[in-house]
Structures are given as C-alpha cells and as structure tokens.
Amino acid sequence: WRDVALYALAVGAGRNDLMYTYEKYLKALPTYGTIPYWGTVNVRPYQWMPLPASMLADEIIKPTISFLNMDHEIIMYRPIDPIKGTFQYQDVITDVYDRGEGKGAVVKTRIDVRDEAGNMVCTNYSTTFFHEAGGFGGKPMPKSDVVIPDREPDFELDDYISPVQNLLYRLTG
C-alpha cells in the first residue's frame, strides 16, 4: 500500500483524498496504471512487431537519449489492487516517424497491462519524441487533424503544486 499512497501524494493528493492515501480503505489512482509505461521508455522492448525489420529501432531507443512525452492515453479495464499484485505487461512499438536530420524522431507505443491471472488491467498508448534521433530515413510524421479554435477557453483551472511534489514523484521510482 505504501507505493500506492506515495504515488498519490506525488501526483498531488491532498487532505481530502484519503481514499488514495489512507490504508484502511485505500484505492489506487487510475493513473497508477501508467507506471509500466515509464518503466519501459528508453528500454529496448522485447517485441518489435509490427514494425518492419528495416526500421532502425536500435538507433532510436538509446538510454543516453533524452525524450519528451508528447501524449499519453490510458484505458482502464478494472481497478488496480492497492495492496498486492504483479503486473505482466507487453510493450509494442506501433509506429516510428522520422522528422529529419536534427529534427528528431517520434515513437508510438502500446502497452497492455495484465494482472497475475492474465486479465487486462489497462492499456497505455503514448507518443514519445526523441530529439536526437532523426535522419534515419523512416516515414515522415503525419500532419495533425487537430484544429485549435480561435476563441476563449471553455474553462480555466488554477492549481497548486507543492514545493516538495517533485521530490515525492522521484521517490516513487
């Protein structure tokens, strides 16, 4: 339960969020399911399919290269047990885009997370930008269909980030 509570504090749980921080009736935040993704970024996945062998994935994913998470989607299928359990996960690179020499590369991945019984817990989809990795001759990044409207936002939210929150997050591993 300690890891689940520490994670909740690290992402901003406060005094009104006892269901995520107090062990008596503890629940795991759904975003706790993103942890398998962060455990595999910059790590060579064991399964490269469905990429063709011609892709130079070894040149893109290197532990010395910094990266930027461009987007992340998590689909939850069941709650995460906050007390005990083991994740089994499969990380698949679904696409690699070459932005050109000096412009980086973009890698799209899917991670299926299962519990010990093999039941799906969640699926993570992400897009990661590796700024030092472009120019390998891969397919170009498709243009975005997103249109940003020229108007005021629907709503705005001011939030507080504790001065120690970054330390708590790093302590989660």
Regions found by a protein language model. Name each.
Residues 1-35, 116-117, 128-173:
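Catalytic strand-loop segment that frames the active site of acyl-thioester-processing enzymes
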Residues 1-86:
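Hydrophobic, proline/glycine-rich low-complexity stretches
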Residues 47, 88-90, 165:
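Residue-identity detector for glutamine
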Residues 69-157:
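HotDog/MaoC-like acyl-thioester-processing domains
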